[in-house]
Amino acid sequence: MPKQLTWDDAEDIGILLSETHPQLDPLAVRFTDLHRYVTELPGFAGDPKASNEGKLEAIQMAWHEEFQDRTQA
């Protein structure tokens, strides 16, 4: 059974978002959209109301690192 993700799994979520939305620049995504993308991920089991700006920033930065790796490769 795959690991269930929560808001604290920024690295894993960043990888999944990079795979799910490879065409998007994470730094151009609004936090409202990022929140929706995260809660729609398969395996995400976190409480949608438990997110905050710090958790979304951490996810955005993890996604951005994956995005940079893909675009620079």
Model-derived segments and spans:
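A charge-rich, low-complexity, intrinsically flexible signal that marks solvent-exposed coils, linkers
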Residues: 2-73
